[in-house]
From Swiss-Prot:
Signal peptide: none annotated. Pfam families: Peptidase_M76. The keyword Aminoacyl-tRNA synthetase does not apply. Disulfide bonds: none annotated. Belongs to the peptidase M76 family. GO terms for molecular function: metal ion binding; metalloendopeptidase activity. The keyword Nuclease does not apply. GO terms for biological process: proteolysis. This is Mitochondrial inner membrane protease ATP23 homolog. The lineage of its organism: Eukaryota, Metazoa, Chordata, Craniata, Vertebrata.
Length: 235
């Protein structure tokens, strides 16, 4: 049992207590509070899936690739530790949304998009999430690059001003932080993995076909994806 716990901690499960042994009990006022958080999370999730052009494109792409996403099956609003906002559990093909750490719709939209990119990678490629840190690094680079995490507006809210090539710097930094949060590896190992795959993964824009720097970009990308899908269907 102790070996299993160590293994789960090394894979980042300590950040998602409800993913582990499930021995946390919710009682009294805490239970009511968690119900409120969960309800709000579910409402914001539905809005994200119905209205976010980023999420809508990814859902279409997943369906096109043969991995249709179902809200009740593939998303789970849960309590998380620390400041983590979400995660993709490759073992269950579920996206975890941290109901205690996501309070605004714009934040929910970004988290859903970020984790759907991981789910898309899981669907289209043979990603060895648990044993190959380079595979994880590639998906984290893509998620940071394509989800809107590193738009100029979001960088300004983090008080990061005037950074040359801020987008690339942000993508590299956030990919590195994500790896260190969920894997028990040294910073040197994580940096090496990011550096080795950065160029190829940064330039892999599927299924968007471009870096969507705004909702407008994402809407155009979604339209282009739908037109491309219709074109191939008519061949």
């Amino acid at each position: 049992m102790e070996e299993k716990k160590i293994e789960q901690d090394e894979l980042g499960y300590q950040l998602f207590p409800e993913r582990g042994n499930g021995d946390r009990k919710k009682q009294g006022l805490l239970s009511k509070s968690l119900f409120t958080f969960n309800h709000k999370c579910q409402v914001m999730l539905k809005i994200a899936l119905d209205t976010s052009p980023y999420a809508k494109l990814l859902l279409d792409a997943m369906k096109h690739t043969g991995c249709t996403v179902y809200k009740d099956r593939h998303f789970s609003c849960e309590e998380c530790d620390g400041s983590v906002s979400g995660g993709f559990d490759a073992a269950t093909s579920e996206i975890v949304l941290c109901q205690n750490n996501i309070h605004q719709q714009s934040h929910m939209n970004r988290v859903v998009t970020h984790e759907l990119i991981h789910a898309f990678d899981h669907c289209r490629a043979h990603v060895d999430w648990f044993n190959n840190v380079r595979h994880l690094a590639c998906s984290e680079i893509r998620a940071a690059n394509l989800s809107g995490d590193c738009t100029l507006a979001n960088e300004l809210t983090r008080f990061k001003f005037g950074v040359k090539e801020h987008h690339k710097v942000c993508v590299r930094d956030r990919a590195l932080r994500s790896i260190l949060a969920v894997r028990n590896v040294s910073r040197e190992t994580a940096e090496k993995a990011v550096d080795e795959v950065f160029d190829s993964c940064f330039n892999d824009h599927e299924p968007f076909g471009r870096i969507p720097h705004s909702k407008t970009d994402a809407k155009f990308a979604h339209r282009d994806f739908q037109n491309r899908d219709r074109y191939y269907a008519n061949l």
